[in-house]
Amino acid sequence: AKLNAIDAGIAAQTIQLAAYTRDLGCCIFLSFDPRKIREVLGIPENLEPLLVLALGFQKEVRRVETVGADGSVKYWRDAQGVHHVPKRPLEDLLIIKK
């Protein structure tokens, strides 16, 4: 259960990083209907889909940016169609004890 989710996350990130090195886009989805995924892909009931990966050639321009002063991590598109993806800085996410 919990370890399966951790392993799935590690595998998904590895696939995403490998895709990036080959100029492919990859998006990890956690919001999906597991019953529909089982039905469409023929996955047996004893297996639980934990995430979905979309993988392919990118059609959009995406910019990963530092979160603004308002603290919002909501994605948005500008007038030119650029997909802005605000992320917290690494320093805010790591706990380093000295």
What are these regions (language model features)?
Residues 1-98:
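Acidic, surface-exposed loops and disordered segments
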